[in-house]
Amino acid sequence: MNNKSIMTDFYELTMAQTYFDSGKKDEEVYFDIFFRNNPFNGGYTLSGGLEEIINYVKNFKYGEEEINYLRSLKIFNEKFLNYLSNLEFKGDIYAVPEGTVVFPNEPVITVKADAVTAQLLETALLACFNHGSLVTTAAKSRKHSCNGVRCP
């Protein structure tokens, strides 16, 4: 499976089916992405991962292979699986610009989408932001510690 849309916590899928089954799939929801601690016990974080998030969302879909895998688990009903096979992101994402200094517990990305899509995006977007910000912050820290001299 090369499709990254399946990159989610299992409970996100079961929650999405719950929204679907309860008739709440089309409700517009918002969720914020934030982080709890600065990397390396530092005083700040630089936002990162936005390009990866944009690419992930642009390519967000469940293909035949992913649907067949989910079907094999015998947990998800056929109506929900059919819905997933046609799902596309039709929402909005608001984010602080790449490289912005950000601090713990403040929203850095806001997602507006239908309840099912928002639920399914959460894990991957958190992973992309956290990894991207870790790398961006580490690079800035390394550059700063070298004080203009080429570091080994």
Language-model features: locations:
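Ordered alpha/beta subdomains of enzyme catalytic regions
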Residues: M1-P152
